[in-house]
């Protein structure tokens, strides 16, 4: 489609990950989206939620990160009796935390699959959160983001059990099984960070 014929729109980016750029470096998905659709306003929509629970009417809280106009539009469109949408300007922090927690969930799942116990899982989560905070600091993200819904909240949910694709992927690896079904987002992020 000719992009000039598409009116500017607000894009709520729900995917989480880090990809390789053309120079072999790493790029957050919002940065990639800005390069691919520069006329559109891109915001990151993330946080601790499983879509099936939200659709079932169970309570959840998410973060919309981006420019004020975009986050307000997302909040107005999605907030309801069971979903609270918080607004934030820290696109980098929300995107980075969302991507990195998937890698940590895979590692946590591996620990479960290998039978390493809850102590090892707790160590992986804690040290993983430390890594998210370090990367966030280097990239200019806000520390509040790391310790909010998009960071700790999403990390806790994603590492809670096999309902998470990334956790299930890691568990399968730990059990020595070939992961089945859809490839977990975190596996691509691992490759981009390697």
Which residues fall in each region the model found?
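Rossmann-like NAD(P)(H) cofactor-binding subdomain of soluble oxidoreductases
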Residues: 1-59, 75-76
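Glycine-rich beta-alpha junction loops
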Residues: 16-18, 46-52, 67-68, 89-94, ...
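NAD(P)-dependent Rossmann-like dehydrogenase/reductase catalytic/cofactor-binding core
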Residues: 101, 108-112, 137-147, 151-194
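Alpha-helical elements of the RecA-like P-loop NTPase motor core of helicases
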Residues: 52, 72, 167
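Glycine/charged-rich beta-loop-alpha catalytic/anionic-binding loops adjacent to active sites
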Residues: 9-11, 88, 174-176
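Amphipathic alpha-helical segments in well-structured domains
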Residues: 26-30, 125, 129, 166, ...
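Internal alpha-helical scaffold of NAD(P)-dependent oxidoreductase catalytic cores
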Residues: 35-42, 59-145
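Catalytic cores of large soluble enzymes that bind and process phosphate-bearing ligands
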Residues: 25, 66, 117, 124, ...
């Amino acid at each position: 489609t000719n992009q000039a014929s598409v009116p500017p729109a607000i894009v709520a980016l729900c995917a989480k990950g880090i990809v390789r750029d053309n120079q072999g470096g790493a790029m957050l998905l919002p940065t990639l989206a800005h390069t691919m659709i520069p006329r559109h306003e891109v915001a990151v929509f993330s946080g601790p939620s499983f879509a099936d629970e939200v659709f079932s009417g169970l309570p959840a809280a998410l973060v919309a990160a981006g420019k004020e106009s975009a986050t307000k539009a997302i909040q107005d469109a999605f907030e309801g009796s069971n979903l609270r949408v918080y607004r934030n300007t820290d696109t980098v922090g929300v995107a980075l935390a969302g991507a990195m927690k998937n890698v940590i969930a895979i590692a946590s799942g591996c620990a479960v699959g290998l039978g390493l116990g809850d102590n090892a899982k707790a160590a992986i989560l804690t040290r993983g959160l430390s890594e998210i905070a370090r990367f966030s600091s280097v990239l200019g993200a806000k520390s509040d983001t790391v310790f909010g819904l998009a960071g700790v909240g999403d990390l806790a949910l994603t590492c809670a059990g096999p309902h998470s694709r990334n956790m299930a992927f890691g568990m399968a690896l730990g059990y020595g099984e070939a992961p089945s079904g859809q490839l977990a987002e975190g596996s691509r992020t691992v490759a981009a960070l390697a």
